[in-house]
Amino acid sequence: MAEQKYRYTLHAVVREEQGKGASRRLRRQGLVPAIIYGGNTEPQAIAIKQDELKKNAKNHSFFSQIINLKIDGQEDQEILVRDVQHHIYKPLFQHFDFQRIVRGQEITATVLLEFVGEERAPGIKTDGGIVSRHMTTVEVICRPSLLPEYIAVDLSEANIGDIITLADLKLPEGVRLVGDMEDEEFAATVVVQISYPQREEQMEDTDTAAADEEGDKEEDADKQE
């Protein structure tokens, strides 16, 4: 079997102490507390460098791709990000939940939608249509080895009024959406649509209506005074 290649690798240490106090001490040292669970193995408390996480997280696919986890003295593990807690106002991670991957067993994961061909779409390039993205990710089920980095949504032939739904997505072989595609309502969920551009007179009407509304509010305020 060929050696698995990973786009992301993390290095961690085992957390001997747990609890809020221990977590605060780790964060002061530039470490982020985390937990690994699943795979018929006991949960394991670990800590990862904040800088290493921030570097990897610059690419959004980090949150949906299989990660190779290295812990000193242990065999490498394959994991997926399951939950992330952020600092309330600082650009820092507070905690990560990871799920162990078991080769051969299907997993559920969030995959990015990548919209391509927009610059060639006649409804956009020629007619000035507006692209409205209703979804940017989808939940999929597949074997770990088949997990795609993203799912492409081709807009190159899109015209004004066109709608792309979940049923229109071209999924890689062995990958399926979480949900019942036999359910017409689910299958018809809108992913992206190309709308008519707003005309100048419509914009003027909108601006006039907003100005009239603001004037009414000022008049009411004057009466109250």
From Swiss-Prot:
SUPFAM superfamilies: Ribosomal protein L25-like. One of its GO terms (biological process) is translation. GO terms for molecular function: 5S rRNA binding; structural constituent of ribosome. It comes from the Bacteria. Gene3D superfamilies: Ribosomal protein L25, beta domain, Ribosomal Protein L25, Chain P. Signal peptide: none annotated. Keywords: Ribonucleoprotein, Ribosomal protein, RNA-binding, rRNA-binding. Residues 202-225 have a biased composition (Acidic residues). Coiled coil: none annotated. It holds the Pfam family Ribosomal_TL5_C. The keyword RNA-binding applies. Residues 197-225 are annotated as: Disordered. GO terms for cellular component: cytosolic large ribosomal subunit. HAMAP family: Ribosomal_bL25 (MF_01336), Ribosomal_bL25_CTC (MF_01334). This is one of the proteins that binds to the 5S RNA in the ribosome where it forms part of the central protuberance. Belongs to the bacterial ribosomal protein bL25 family. CTC subfamily. Part of the 50S ribosomal subunit; part of the 5S rRNA/L5/L18/L25 subcomplex. Contacts the 5S rRNA. Binds to the 5S rRNA independently of L5 and L18. This is Large ribosomal subunit protein bL25. It comes from Dichelobacter nodosus (strain VCS1703A). The lineage of its organism: Bacteria, Pseudomonadati, Pseudomonadota, Gammaproteobacteria, Cardiobacteriales. The gene is rplY.
